[in-house]
Structure formats: structure tokens, C-alpha cells
Amino acid sequence: QLACRDRSRIALESDLLSAAMLGIDNILCLTGDHTKMGDHPQAKPVFDLDSVSLLHTVKLLESGVDLGGNELVGEPPKFSKGAVVSPCSDSVDAQLAKMERKVAAGAEYFQTQAVFEPEKFIKFMEKAKQFGKPVQVGIIIPKSAGMAKFMNNNVAGIHVPDEMLEELKADKEKTKAGITGVEIAARIIKECKPYCQGVHIMALGWESKIPDLDPDLCIRNRFCRDAKPRCLVRAFRQIQKL
């Protein structure tokens, strides 16, 4: 993930070229949330570029030229360029317009904001098919009703329905153990999988619960059981192939 919030265009180009040298070829281009939403609200945001212009920058580097018009030395980098979209946003048309601009700028795949309303996701995907780009549905395992309320109030593009809030409140011990959250997330995955090309799990510290979400996600490998970063990367590559 490469966010524009904290970096100038020079820093972003530097990070991209460094990533290429290290063999990192999958890039997710993000504008980034404003610093006021994080735990350092006094920090000054940069936003020299946004996600669309960052995608354009990546394409430019791939052609062998940087944003200053300088030719790169050696073989140009080659990336798999991703972007994000919020299918459950209040304005679907605005999200589709953003998606179109990102595709035009070079986006090859999309990851979505966390989905808690499968019916909205399915309707969005019916319209997003026109772009012909693979989409990975975003899944968060909700840890508590408080967490769900926080996301409703503070995270754009996310809405946890009232019935899910009540489900998280119903049995506090079950919720604390992660059972309720896994049940909710697994249900969402099951409903959304036929309409997308992958699943992006944002476990937020509950990586060990990933195998419980859907046997199809992890049964072909045992890496997720270890819940270690390197193993999870391999597991994610397996998920992408499903």
C-alpha cells in the first residue's frame, strides 16, 4: 500500500523505484485518510498527489520517465497496479466515476472498503462489471459492537447494519472470543464471493482467525494457521488464485 497523505511526489517516486529494486511488484495506490482521523491529528498532511495521479506516476515510471521528465537509468520497473473503491458508499455513481478515472489512469485491479452490506456490494458489482477489472471484496472481522459503531461514525464508506450490531451485543463472551465476528465475516464472504474475484481480509490483529472464515480460503495451504506475516503473504497469493 502506498498512500499520498505523507509523501511528496519525489518521495513516492523514490518508494516506487526502491520497491522495484527489492522485487516488490504489487502496488495499491491510495490517497490516504486525513491525519485528523488518526492518532496523530496534529500531523501535517502532504497530498501532493492523489490516487489517480499516483497511478499515472506509476505508468510514467514504467515507460522509463519520472514526473520531472527525467529518463530512468536501466530497465524501467513493472508493477501490478491496484486501487480502492467503496461499493457501499452513499453515492454509487460517484464511486463508479472514481473507478472509471482510476482504470483510465492504469488501475489493473481493485480492493474495496470493508463490506458489511452484501446486497449493496452485489448491486455495485453489477454496474462495475463494465470496467472488466478484478475486484477483491474487503472483509473486516468485527471485534465488538463498539468497534462497529466507531466505524459507522468515523470511517467513510462503511456502514454496519443495526441487526449486526445487535448480533455483536447479544452474547458478549461469544463476541469477545471472536466467534460472532467470524460468523458475520464468513457470512459476508459467502454472499459476496460469487460476484467478485478475490477476498481481501483485514484481520486487524485476528490473523489466527482467518482459517475459520471459509475453508476454501485456507484449506489448500496451512500457512494461515501459523498467522505469521510471511505465511500470510503466501496464503493471500493462494486466495487470489481462487
Q: Residue spans of the language-model regions?
A:
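Hydrophobic faces of well-ordered beta-strands that scaffold small-molecule active sites
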Residues: 1-2, 27-29, 81-85, 110-112, ...
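A generic, well-ordered mixed alpha/beta core segment in the N-terminal half of proteins
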Residues: 2-35
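Short, ordered loop/turn segments at secondary-structure junctions
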Residues: 3-5, 29-35, 114-115, 140-142, ...
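Active-site-adjacent beta->alpha loops and helix N-cap segments on the catalytic face
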Residues: 8-14, 34-54, 66, 92-93, ...
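Short, acidic/polar
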Residues: 10-16, 91-101, 182-189
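Conserved, mostly hydrophobic/aromatic
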Residues: 19, 102, 106, 137, ...
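Active-site pocket-lining/capping segments in soluble small-molecule metabolic enzymes
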Residues: 32, 45-74, 84-89, 132-188, ...
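N-terminal low-complexity segments that are often proline-rich with Ser/Thr-Pro
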Residues: 221-242
